[in-house]
Amino acid sequence: MRKAILVLLLVCARPVFGQAPPEGIWQGYDGEWRHVSKQLVDLAEATPEDKFSWRPAPGVRSTSEVYMHIALANFYLLSVTGPKMPADLKEGMEKTVTSKPEVIAWLKRSLDAVKEAHASVTPKDLERKVRIEDRDATVDGMYLRIIVHANEHMGQLVAYARMTGVAPPWSKKE
């Protein structure tokens, strides 16, 4: 009987060990960043161009404005940690860059900038003190703010997508 139970446990456990680890928290910051970056880009690419100008109400950011807000915030928050803002980044781009290809290009560029900058920091760098607006923070805290901000607006964009009839690509696989 014990032998049968052991064989059954081994047979059942084999598929668990054969699976790739899920992307995200099990891979730390870099895994989470890859995950939210992929979702943001996949959702932007799945959204028809005519939905980029959609907004849920007057005075609320449009779809393109939310994506550009994420991109510009990524560059700004990253600049607090040391890297320079892109020279071609101009004030007001959140409202002036509205075409799907341009928005996605800026989004990808900002996501890659965060990924590359984070890959180059050392544990000691993460402890370094920085100043943002009127308060002190650490580089590690800034990276946390960047990923939290991206996820916050991912939720907003999922709501926008569903309100305009777009299903997030990852939800279609379930």
Give the ranges of each region predicted by the language model.
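Acidic/histidine-rich alpha-helical segments that form the ligand environment
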Residues: K95-V130, A137-H149
